[in-house]
Amino acid sequence: MSLNATLFAQLVVFFILAWFTMKFVWPPITKALDERASKIADGLAAADRAKTELASANKRVEEQLASVRDENARRLADAEKRALAIVEDAKKRATEEGSKIVAAAKSEAEQQLVQARESLREQVAALAVKGAEQILKREVNAGVHADLLSRLKTEL
């Protein structure tokens, strides 16, 4: 066989192999590559969506956290205001109660002072009558001299 015939036969076999490969082998390979590329693209798209959703969720969480912090700060401020109001009310009531107690004590002391003065006047009047009795060596009649004794009490 000559070199030309061998070369020609190999060329024919090569083209038959190429045609067979293009017809039967190449389509499943390209289909598998296309499916793989599609899966990779879907995976990347899903990753991008997940990344976007994560960013959105993080934003919502931050907003909720800020809202909760604001609400807690507001509640704390309200509690402090209520505590101050309660303390101020207690101080006011204590001051009023103290004023009432002081007023009652002053009133009681004034009454005791008036009673003590009245008792002292009566005692002084009785002593004055006794002294006058002894000076005069006679008995002074309280009923007869009631006007004189009452004037003496008021002067003392």
From Swiss-Prot:
<dbReference type="InterPro" id="IPR028987">
    <property type="entry name" value="ATP_synth_B-like_membr_sf"/>
</dbReference>
<keyword id="KW-0812">Transmembrane</keyword>
<dbReference type="InterPro" id="IPR050059">
    <property type="entry name" value="ATP_synthase_B_chain"/>
</dbReference>
<comment type="subunit">
    <text>F-type ATPases have 2 components, F(1) - the catalytic core - and F(0) - the membrane proton channel. F(1) has five subunits: alpha(3), beta(3), gamma(1), delta(1), epsilon(1). F(0) has four main subunits: a(1), b(2) and c(10-14). The alpha and beta chains form an alternating ring which encloses part of the gamma chain. F(1) is attached to F(0) by a central stalk formed by the gamma and epsilon chains, while a peripheral stalk is formed by the delta and b chains.</text>
</comment>
<dbReference type="InterPro" id="IPR002146">
    <property type="entry name" value="ATP_synth_b/b'su_bac/chlpt"/>
</dbReference>
<keyword id="KW-0472">Membrane</keyword>
<keyword id="KW-0375">Hydrogen ion transport</keyword>
<keyword id="KW-0813">Transport</keyword>
<comment type="function">
    <text>Component of the F(0) channel, it forms part of the peripheral stalk, linking F(1) to F(0).</text>
</comment>
<feature type="transmembrane region" description="Helical">
    <location>
        <begin position="7"/>
        <end position="27"/>
    </location>
</feature>
<dbReference type="GO" id="GO:0005886">
    <property type="term" value="C:plasma membrane"/>
</dbReference>
<keyword id="KW-0138">CF(0)</keyword>
<dbReference type="GO" id="GO:0046961">
    <property type="term" value="F:proton-transporting ATPase activity, rotational mechanism"/>
</dbReference>
<keyword id="KW-0406">Ion transport</keyword>
<dbReference type="InterPro" id="IPR005864">
    <property type="entry name" value="ATP_synth_F0_bsu_bac"/>
</dbReference>
<dbReference type="Pfam" id="PF00430">
    <property type="entry name" value="ATP-synt_B"/>
</dbReference>
<keyword id="KW-1133">Transmembrane helix</keyword>
<dbReference type="GO" id="GO:0046933">
    <property type="term" value="F:proton-transporting ATP synthase activity, rotational mechanism"/>
</dbReference>
<comment type="similarity">
    <text>Belongs to the ATPase B chain family.</text>
</comment>
<dbReference type="GO" id="GO:0045259">
    <property type="term" value="C:proton-transporting ATP synthase complex"/>
</dbReference>
<keyword id="KW-1003">Cell membrane</keyword>
<protein>
    <recommendedName>
        <fullName>ATP synthase subunit b</fullName>
    </recommendedName>
</protein>
<comment type="function">
    <text>F(1)F(0) ATP synthase produces ATP from ADP in the presence of a proton or sodium gradient. F-type ATPases consist of two structural domains, F(1) containing the extramembraneous catalytic core and F(0) containing the membrane proton channel, linked together by a central stalk and a peripheral stalk. During catalysis, ATP synthesis in the catalytic domain of F(1) is coupled via a rotary mechanism of the central stalk subunits to proton translocation.</text>
</comment>
<keyword id="KW-0997">Cell inner membrane</keyword>
<keyword id="KW-0066">ATP synthesis</keyword>
